[in-house]
Amino acid sequence: MARYRHSRSRSRSRYRRRRRRRRSRYRGRRRRYRRSRRRRRRGRRRGNCLGRRGYRRRRYSRRRRRRYY
């Protein structure tokens, strides 16, 4: 019983530490992503739109063909 209790307490502490780290990392990524997105939109607006349109058209055509056949 002593061994079981020890392993149980160990796993609990590990789980708590992982949870806290994940939260802090997610918050940092969110802020950085928003800042980078705003900067990119101002500079490369035309190129982005053209690239996205072509990519979307190709994707949808492939999906429709698969469904019909």
Curated annotation (Swiss-Prot):
Residues 1-69 are annotated as: Disordered. It is found in: Nucleus; Chromosome. Its main location: nucleus. Protamines substitute for histones in the chromatin of sperm during the haploid phase of spermatogenesis. They compact sperm DNA into a highly condensed, stable and inactive complex. This is Sperm protamine P1. One of its GO terms (biological process) is sperm DNA condensation. One of its GO terms (cellular component) is nucleus. Belongs to the protamine P1 family.
